[in-house]
Amino acid sequence: MGDSDRDSGGGQNGNNQNGQSSLSPREQDRFLPIANVSRIMKKALPANAKISKDAKETMQECVSEFISFVTGEASDKCQKEKRKTINGDDLLWAMTTLGFEDYVEPLKVYLQRFREIEGERTGLGRPQTGGEVGEHQRDAVGDGGGFYGGGGGMQYHQHHQFLHQQNHMYGATGGGSDSGGGAASGRTRT
């Protein structure tokens, strides 16, 4: 954050001059914990790279909004189908609908692998069918600290390494900078 932002008390996420959050508890619930966002960012960068507070806060807001955007679309689909549980397939459908189709194939592979690992971890020896989040999967994708911060599930480095091995890291599907997918598609949610 620049000096003028700091001096004026401005800045993202409502942090005041003392570095304390001035967001209400309700507003704070909208964002992923900044420590988790920072940890994920650091793992994607060289060991000696530094990340400014402003960059962390910006990324925190962006990823939180992205999650809300995709989840909202999946939720709308589930409501129309009179279902209460959003599953991984609903999220993939939402990403396609919203213009993030370049990410869907690597995520399908990841979701299948995640289900296989979860099946092995619970001793079932087989993945769950239907794609709904079961009791044993909540630690990894919902309650209990979230995907990157909680106990259970595939750890971040496995996830990161897996996507990198699939040669789809950061949407790199061979299309270069003008591959035309994702947020630059100009689509808005109605």
From Swiss-Prot:
Residue ranges: DNA binding: 32-38
GO terms, molecular function: DNA-binding transcription activator activity, RNA polymerase II-specific; DNA-binding transcription factor activity; protein heterodimerization activity; transcription cis-regulatory region binding; transcription coregulator activity
Source organism of this protein record: Arabidopsis thaliana
Keyword Protease: no
Tissue specificity of this protein: Ubiquitous. Predominantly expressed in flowers and siliques.
Function: Component of the NF-Y/HAP transcription factor complex. The NF-Y complex stimulates the transcription of various genes by recognizing and binding to a CCAAT motif in promoters.
Subunit relationships: Heterotrimeric transcription factor composed of three components, NF-YA, NF-YB and NF-YC. NF-YB and NF-YC must interact and dimerize for NF-YA association and DNA binding. Binds directly with DPB3-1.
Full protein name: Nuclear transcription factor Y subunit B-2
PROSITE patterns from the UniProt entry: NFYB_HAP3
